[in-house]
Regions:
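Catalytic core of pol beta-like nucleotidyltransferases
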Residues: 1-25, 34-39, 50-110
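Glycine-rich beta-strand-to-loop/alpha-helix junction loops that act as flexible
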Residues: 29-31
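Short, conserved active-site loops that position catalytic residues or coordinate cofactors/metal ions
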Residues: 41-43
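Short hydrophobic/aromatic beta-strand micro-patches
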Residues: 46-48
Length: 110
């Protein structure tokens, strides 16, 4: 459960992920990003980062850094190569998130 106006919590979660994993991007998606969240809505985050872990392990790795929490968190983690490949295919989760999500963090490119 997450209160829709809890910007401070969202910023804290984003900072924690950035400090620990140094992702390329973090995007909020789902009902929270669309402004349709209610008291039962969870927090859906897309994370683009370099990793050698398999997809299920990526989710556990990110989710576990928050331990027990009073809010629900769902994450999807893709590598930059996966994002490049999947963004070109209409209807994939990546293409939908990029079109409809709210960017919370994007690493500056030099």
């Amino acid at each position: 459960m997450l209160h829709m106006n809890n910007t401070e919590l969202l910023e804290q979660i984003t900072r924690t992920i950035v400090d620990r994993f140094h992702p390329r991007r973090i995007i909020l998606f789902g009902s929270q990003a669309r402004g349709e969240a209610n008291s039962e809505s969870d927090l859906d985050l897309f994370i683009e980062m370099e990793t050698q872990a398999r997809p299920p392990e990526r989710v556990v790795e990110v989710s576990s850094i928050f331990g027990l929490r009073p809010w629900s968190l769902d994450v999807v983690v893709f590598t930059p190569d996966e994002v490049q490949r999947l963004r070109r295919i209409n209807g994939t989760l990546v293409s939908v998130i990029e079109a409809e999500g709210k960017v919370l963090y994007e690493r500056p490119s030099f």
